[in-house]
């Protein structure tokens, strides 16, 4: 596949993201506008819960209401208070989110507690399922570090009902890597849940070339047809600039951001 072809696919699989402490209505509207490109739209925009209604309005105003709106809960620290995670997820759904990205209590798992992660995901899934909202679970691979823990967090999340497993918050030093992606994709394959569980690489994917590597990896493990927006996403902000550069035959630009 040519770089242009993979860049076009990657754009359609993006969750175009702004999760900054200084986000404003204006910044969220600008993000939605960035997603309306001559090469199509991303799968979703991802914003903090309070900005979901503004994003909905902005997407509708520009005629791109097919773009989903994702948000985050238990974010970014992945605390182990189930009640708070569930309350935040209920609030996110009430704001009108189509998709919720919840942070798995990864520190609890690192301390040996598997049950709390299962229960947290299971209860957030119940909230989402009742409103037909997709649940993505962020396992924070850069903090789990070992293949064993990355696999365990993936397995627990899937068994508790995750619709997607996602690498990272983008708020820790190490975010998505091909190594952690391979472990997560192989877990989806090994548990035989590829028909109902997707994968999201988040943070650190900044160029069309890098995106192409993730697409190739997913196709290698789960098959060419599996890679679509129902099963595969990139969580990113700066990636869009370089995908558009590749599609226009231009060089990568140095971009800051997620």
UniProtKB/Swiss-Prot annotation:
Similarity comment: Belongs to the DeoC/FbaB aldolase family. DeoC type 2 subfamily.
Catalytic activity: 2-deoxy-D-ribose 5-phosphate = D-glyceraldehyde 3-phosphate + acetaldehyde
GO molecular function terms listed in the Swiss-Prot or TrEMBL record: deoxyribose-phosphate aldolase activity
GN (gene name): deoC
One Pfam entry name: DeoC
Name this protein carries in UniProt: Deoxyribose-phosphate aldolase
EC number: 4.1.2.4
Swiss-Prot/TrEMBL keywords: Cytoplasm, Lyase, Schiff base
Record pathway: Carbohydrate degradation; 2-deoxy-D-ribose 1-phosphate degradation; D-glyceraldehyde 3-phosphate and acetaldehyde from 2-deoxy-alpha-D-ribose 1-phosphate: step 2/2
NCBIfam families, per the entry: deoC
Biological processes per GO annotation: 2-deoxyribose 1-phosphate catabolic process; carbohydrate catabolic process; deoxyribonucleotide catabolic process
Function: Catalyzes a reversible aldol reaction between acetaldehyde and D-glyceraldehyde 3-phosphate to generate 2-deoxy-D-ribose 5-phosphate.
């Amino acid at each position: 596949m040519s770089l242009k072809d993979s860049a076009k696919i990657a754009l359609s699989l993006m969750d175009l993201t702004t999760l900054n402490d200084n986000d404003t209505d204006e910044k969220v509207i600008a993000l939605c506008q960035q997603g309306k490109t001559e090469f199509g739209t991303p799968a979703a925009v991802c914003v903090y819960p309070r900005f979901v209604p503004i994003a909905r309005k902005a997407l509708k105003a520009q005629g791109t209401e097919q773009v989903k709106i994702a948000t985050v809960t238990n974010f970014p620290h992945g605390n182990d208070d189930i009640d708070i995670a569930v309350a935040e997820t209920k609030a996110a759904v009430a704001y009108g989110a189509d998709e919720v990205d919840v942070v798995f209590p990864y520190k609890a798992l690192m301390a040996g507690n598997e049950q709390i992660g299962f229960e947290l995901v299971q209860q957030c899934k119940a909230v989402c399922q009742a409103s037909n909202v997709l649940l993505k679970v962020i396992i924070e691979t850069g903090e789990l570090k070992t293949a064993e823990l990355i696999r365990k967090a993936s397995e627990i999340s899937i068994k508790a009902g995750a619709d997607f497993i996602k690498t990272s918050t983008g708020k820790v030093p190490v975010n998505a890597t091909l190594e952690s992606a391979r472990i997560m994709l192989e877990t989806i394959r090994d548990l035989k849940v590829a028909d109902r569980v997707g994968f999201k690489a988040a943070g650190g994917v900044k160029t069309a070339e890098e995106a192409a590597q993730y697409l190739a990896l997913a196709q290698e493990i789960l098959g060419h047809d599996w890679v679509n927006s129902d099963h595969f996403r990139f969580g990113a902000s700066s990636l869009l600039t370089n995908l558009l550069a590749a599609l226009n035959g231009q060089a990568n630009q140095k971009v800051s951001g997620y």
